[in-house]
Amino acid sequence: NNKKFKIWIQIAAFSNIKSAKILQDKFKEIQNINVHKVFLKGRNIYRVRVGPFLSIDKADSVYNFLIAKGMQGTKFIVE
C-alpha cells in the first residue's frame, strides 16, 4: 500500500459555522487553521482543524500549544 497519510489536528467540531469561525479566529496565529464542513447524521458539522502536517514533530508542537491554551478536546486525525 503506497497511500500517503495526512496528519491533522482537530481542535473542535460545531453544529454552526459561527462558532467554528470564532474559534478559528481565536487561533489565527496558527498556520493552516481551517474550518472543514462535513455532512454527518443528517446535519452539517464544522470541524476546526490545523494541517495537514508534514512531520509528527510539528504536529506535536501545535498540539501541545493548543492543550496549554485550554483546548482539552484537541485530537490527532490521520487520513
Question: Where is each model-derived feature located?
Answer:
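Conserved beta3-strand ATP-binding lysine motif
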Residues: 12
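Extracytoplasmic
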Residues: 2-5, 15-79
